[in-house]
Amino acid sequence: MDLVEAEAEEQPPDEDGDEEGYVEADPAGRFIRYDEIVGSGAVKTVYKAFDKLEGVEVAWSQSRIDDSVMGSSKKMKQLNTEIQLLKTLKHKNIEKMFASWVDGEKKTVNIITELFTSGSLTQYRRKHKKVNMKAMKRWAIQILTGLEYLHSQKPAIIHRDLKCDNIFINGNHGKVKIGDFGLATFMQQQKKSIKGTLEFMAPELLTGHYNELVDIYSFGMCMLEMVTCEYPYSECQGMAHIFKKIDEGKKPAAFYKIKDAEVRSFIENCLAPVENRMSATELLKSSFLQDDDLISVSLVKNMSEDGQQPVSCMLRKGEFLLTGNVDVASHVDLWLRFPDPSGCFKSVEFPFNLTEDTSLSVAVEMVEQFGLTQDSRPIIAQLIDAFLVILIPEWTPCVAIRQVVSEGANGLTIEKR
């Protein structure tokens, strides 16, 4: 073995003899590999392994090294430098690397990482077909947070092969991490070469001139796969057809199957031409990814005669938007925009009688009239009560208002009820 580098302590020999069932051990003797495969790719196989020091299962990745790289001391040095760089990454949404070494005899790069009990996002979505958009938003936030960290490095680290197969999840607590940092790309030693998975490649990546925003495009394709459970461009016949559609800037057929306008808009922002494409930081601030439990309030500057309180405001919770005006002491005119069962947005204007109506009774009536899901009822009721609490301080809400976030000239305030 040459270029051996493993962050592992030397282990004493087992008192009871050799471990049974393992295939090989790392140079330091800390990790042992079993023959059980947990994942594989064109040049890589991932096995289940065991950390004898910590007593936990880990993943052992073996990637084949091209002969042209093995025969070049310069390229091998560059490969080893890249591995060392990846080992310095420390982030909650980046896969942890525990040890690594190059086996010159077997012509492989060996990397020990944490093991994800639920596999990749691709495997997880195939197993669990019914996933709420709220959960997928949490996954998206974690992926973007990891990308934001990578892209903030000096110089920026570009994944180049981001896809759901390279994003891993522990299903028991929903933690998502980015892994598999395209070592095959560095093994080829062509930084600007066309390497990766074609279906997830940004058009500019095909030209060889790109920046970290290629990862955002790939993230958009990941979102598309998460939402539709369809692999991008699965409608195409062969790689040449896929290449042509990407080169022409045509989106996968799966994109046009998305009924939710807000989801489509978010994905479209990720797939935009590079000059218009948002960064990870910008996407994390998008309204689409904001906490649905928050009620965002925009206060209109018009003031009542005493100058103390606004007579109009706009509230938003998830995809629901409510605005209105207090006309007289006992009467309020409200306007609500909401997603209907078909995925389109509908708007309705209605009066609210302060002496006869309650937020809950109105919400129940709307759910029945427009065929909305039962989840819509508490959202509508909370928006109405929050609106009235802001404009009529003495109003007593009939549902719990978890959190109201008001944005105005005086900055941000948070009021919990």
Curated annotation (Swiss-Prot):
Keywords: ATP-binding, Kinase, Nucleotide-binding, Serine/threonine-protein kinase, Transferase. It holds the Pfam family Pkinase. It comes from the Eukaryota. The active site is at D180 (proton acceptor). GO terms for biological process: intracellular signal transduction. Signal peptide: none annotated. PROSITE patterns: PROTEIN_KINASE_DOM (PS50011), PROTEIN_KINASE_ST (PS00108). SUPFAM superfamilies: Protein kinase-like (PK-like) (SSF56112). InterPro entries: Kinase-like_dom_sf, Prot_kinase_dom, Ser/Thr_kinase_AS, WNK_Ser-Thr_kinase. Belongs to the protein kinase superfamily. Ser/Thr protein kinase family. WNK subfamily. This is Probable serine/threonine-protein kinase WNK9. The gene is WNK9.
